[in-house]
């Protein structure tokens, strides 16, 4: 079972949710499928991305792995049922690679900032590589989460949690990312 290694202000880290060997296999998979990736590059972010929805069996397996940690996050943060979404779903899983000593990074931002992202209520990043740099930082809270194989980082996606993916200087950084979304049922719409 994964170990809780950080739980502060709803920023929660679990270590060991994926075995190191599986992390290595997933990285190999990414590199073998590099022709299915695209380069995301703007003035405030740069990385290589593979959307796992193009390979449904992998996306389903990763989603199945993440679901129990949503419940554990709720429990570990003492979130009561009356304020937690009664139903939710996961956004498509994205696989990202940040190369060292390049412009790859994701400057300070929030992950739910408009109509297209407003149904997100929980961020989930799984680190697949060990890195001495490339931390996910929360400058307002003086928290930095180091990339570590098999580590899961969870936190709210809104403007109260601005964060950044810092530049990598040692080896490529690989992460899987998804979001829990509010899933509106017809009888909930009022």
Where are these regions (language model features)?
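Fe(II)/2-oxoglutarate oxygenase catalytic core
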Residues: 1-152, 160-190
């Amino acid at each position: 079972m994964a170990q809780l290694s950080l739980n502060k202000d709803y920023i929660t880290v679990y270590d060991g949710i994926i075995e190191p060997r599986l992390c290595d296999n997933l990285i190999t998979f990414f590199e073998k499928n590099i022709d299915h990736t695209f380069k995301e590059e703007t003035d405030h972010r740069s990385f290589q991305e593979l959307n796992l929805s193009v390979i449904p069996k992998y996306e389903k397996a990763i989603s199945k792995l993440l679901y129990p940690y949503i419940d554990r996050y709720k429990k570990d943060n003492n979130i009561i049922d009356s304020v937690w979404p009664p139903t939710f779903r996961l956004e498509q899983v994205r696989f990202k690679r940040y190369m060292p000593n390049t412009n790859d990074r994701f400057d300070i931002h929030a992950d739910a900032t408009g109509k297209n992202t407003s149904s997100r209520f929980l961020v989930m990043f799984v680190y697949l590589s060990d890195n001495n740099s490339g931390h996910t930082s929360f400058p307002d809270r003086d928290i930095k989460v180091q990339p570590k194989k098999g580590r899961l980082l969870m936190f709210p996606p809104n403007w109260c949690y601005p964060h950044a993916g810092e530049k990598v200087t040692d080896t490529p950084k690989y992460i899987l990312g998804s979001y829990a979304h509010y899933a509106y049922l017809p009888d909930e719409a009022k």
